[in-house]
């Protein structure tokens, strides 16, 4: 379990090259600055930004093959996990979906500042996004699980990997969705908090 900011930084550094780490450092610096103007993340979490946001995002890569096609990040907000993934793995195509104007502006500015040619921002509600096949679907605090699965199912294929960070109620949330979805997922312990977990899934529910 990651217990300190130093451990969190080391965890991230082990999963990307030096250039990737420079991009993440730049992201953290920009986040600290911008958070004084808009509440991208809670002020209390900035003291543990590497644990709470960066490593928490980076750990999802451990559950995903590098050859997965498009990474679709729903409700990207401040950029977690999608922007972190794009910065750490610039060869991986990433699409950040976010409807809130100020968040869209922040994400667009960071994609440009970090020179992430692999990353695009869709500034719209997910319901309006044109259907496309996603190799990975991620979502952090986007919507209740049942709604999330219902809205995003049209982007999934038989080989799609789902990585959905959740809190202590992850297993309970999974029990609350239909059986056709339950059988695709299992619960993984988060490495950043004993009270957090990740719902990891594979494939698409059969209708």
Curated annotation (Swiss-Prot):
EC number of this enzyme: 2.1.1.170
InterPro entries attached to this UniProt entry: rRNA_ssu_MeTfrase_G, SAM-dependent_MTases_sf
MF-aspect GO terms: rRNA (guanine-N7-)-methyltransferase activity
GO CC terms: cytosol
Name the record gives this protein: Ribosomal RNA small subunit methyltransferase G
Cited function: Specifically methylates the N7 position of guanine in position 527 of 16S rRNA.
NCBIfam families: rsmG_gidB
Primary enzyme class: transferase
Source organism of the structure: Erythrobacter litoralis (strain HTCC2594)
Substrates-to-products reaction catalysed: guanosine(527) in 16S rRNA + S-adenosyl-L-methionine = N(7)-methylguanosine(527) in 16S rRNA + S-adenosyl-L-homocysteine
Protein family: Belongs to the methyltransferase superfamily. RNA methyltransferase RsmG family.
Residues reported in the UniProt entry to bind S-adenosyl-L-methionine: 75, 80, 126-127, 140
Lineage top rank: taxon: Bacteria
Key words, A-Z: Cytoplasm, Methyltransferase, rRNA processing, S-adenosyl-L-methionine, Transferase
Subcellular location: Cytoplasm
